[in-house]
Amino acid sequence: MRLLNGKQPLLRHGGAGNRTTATSDYLALRQAQNLMAAAQYALVIGKPLTRHLTIRLEQQGIADTDAVKAIGRLITLLRDHVRKTTNGEIAYIWSREHGAVIGGHVHILLHLPTGYVWKGQRLQRWIERISGKRYRTGTIKTTRIGRTAKAHERNPNLYLANLAIVVGYLVKGTCPKAGAELELERIKAQGRVMGKRCGRSQI
């Protein structure tokens, strides 16, 4: 893998535990329930998920076999930076998908503590470091849940409505039977992925 700015990329091929051949086509009922419960619990403990981050991993040259490790590296970099600059903690849930057009990607819902300064360029540098490739335009998309950083405080009804929509979007790839049991408004297959399909912080 090509070095970037003289630095070794964080993703390295080979080695025990770096790859997995297990695949999945849907989120299982338990996985979807866990993501939904984690989003609700984050709100209860004062760590509302306020940012929706989408990373087009395949577009950035990150193979499906390396996707889980890349997501973990990104979350670790963000967590450590948040701790260093605010002495606070993040919370998150994430779900991977594989689209026919954009390929492998991940949706991450984040809580960032008050006072943390979000900078897109910093995130781009991390993505470059993880992938070992120059940032490709369109790899990162980010929006605020509830439209503003403090929507959960200033307009809680709007925030909760938007949060429900975004979490529903995150779990739309649940298998049809489970989706019906959860009464999801949107159920749509989101492609086959290799390795872990979703995750959450230990909040």
Describe each region flagged by the PLM.
Residues 1-104, 112-203:
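Right-hand nucleic-acid polymerase module
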